[in-house]
Amino acid sequence: HRQAQSQRARTLGMLLLPLEADFSIPLRRAPNVKEACAEAYGVGEEPSVVSLRELLGVIGAHEWRKKGVDIPVLGDRIHPHYGVFSPVRGEYIGLVAEAPLPTMKLAFDIGTGTGVLAAVLAKRGVKHVIATDQDPRALACARQNIARLGLLGRVEVVETDLFPEGRAPLIVCNPPWLPARANSPLEHAIYDPQSRMLLGFLNGLAAHLEPGGEGWLI
């Protein structure tokens, strides 16, 4: 099964489709992918080509962004953007929703992505959550989700590499789990080259925890 999947991925990666500057596909009966491509790539400037594999990923990300992912503990949906990890499998969210909280005062969410864990902590009653990321896609995604959930007064989204300034009694992190280099922006959310983020979190945790604080690696 894995071999068949790998072969399919290679085949889709070798098939190239033309895109006009406005992201239209100049082929008969081609679908309209303008909005999906604009969300993924920004403003088009010149004609280009894209692999079918990449384009299918762009379309899939667009659909997830439109309909969102249901998060039962929030009683609402999270809308992931292209290149930002989608919380489709929510086991780790359940852990954060149920684990005893050491504080209701302050928490850091490192590598927030969609902002889902920051939102869960805020919904549980943490008064101030600082959610960090350095990826522009993730920052925009988290800010939109936090605003839509009505949590702007409790969750602050900050652009920084790993930790914000200061210390907190609770620091959570759900890093990408594959220690390899991503082949496309769509894969960026699940790859951590040379475990850089994981090691950075572990090595910097003690310096950013308050005495007696807790770090949750999820």
Give the positions of each predicted feature.
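N-terminal auxiliary segments of SAM/dcSAM-dependent transferases
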Residues: 1-69
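Soluble or luminal CAZymes and related metallo-dependent hydrolases
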Residues: 4, 119, 134, 193, ...
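Class I SAM-dependent transferase core
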Residues: 53-101
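Conserved RecA-like P-loop NTPase ATPase core
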Residues: 80, 146, 174, 201, ...
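Conserved SAM/SAH cofactor-binding pocket of Class I
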Residues: 89-173, 179-183
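Glycine-rich S-adenosyl-L-methionine
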Residues: 185-210
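Conserved beta-strand signature within the Rossmann-like core of class I S-adenosyl-L-methionine
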Residues: 212-218
